């Protein structure tokens, strides 16, 4: 939509099974258009580049907030993602500074408690 921040999201629908997947690898802000794309999807794979907006500052000393690089932090998108009815919800493209990469981190525990997974290399998704 005109005037909204950049959001890249692709919706795939399997005509044979009726299954659908939304892959949103670049989410600068949660928009009404993104909400509409996710509605009714069976699986959602969302931008999980950073968990916290100030992650780069703490990890590298560089003051580069996640939002200024076009990535809505997981801490700010998790509740919105949780509100959708998809059977599977995953974050992908996690930066090496993202604490949710560690399976024993509080951030990963928060996601898992919300029914949200972290995608991994070799993951196969059925629609």
PLM features per residue range, with description:
Residues 8-12:
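Short beta-strand scaffold segments in enzyme catalytic cores
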Residues 5, 18-20, 28-122:
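Cap/insert and terminal regions of metallo-dependent hydrolase folds
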Residues 1-2:
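Short Gly/Pro-enriched turn/cap motifs at secondary-structure boundaries
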Residues 14-21, 127:
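Beta-strand-turn-beta hairpins that frame and shape the catalytic cleft
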